């Protein structure tokens, strides 16, 4: 698989199959799943707070 080189420390047998995006950026996955709702929330929250979460 192409992204195996990117995540060398992630083994397929660990915790079953984990989506690459979840490994790379868990917060980003949440935004993608609930895009409209999360993007609306992000507009009302200072960027510093979003990064800190």
UniProtKB/Swiss-Prot annotation:
Domain of life: Eukaryota
Keywords on record: Developmental protein, Membrane
Presence of the UniProt keyword Membrane in the record: yes
Protein name as annotated: Neuronal protein NP-190
Gene Ontology cellular component list: membrane
Its job: Neuronal antigen that may play a role in brain development. May be involved in neurite formation or axonal guidance.
Protein's UniProt keywords contain Membrane: yes
Location relative to the cell: Membrane
Tissue and organ expression note: Mainly expressed in the fetal brain where it is specifically localized to the proximal axonal segments, cell bodies and growth cones. Lower level of expression was also detected in the fetal heart and the skeletal muscle. No expression in kidney, liver, lung or spleen.
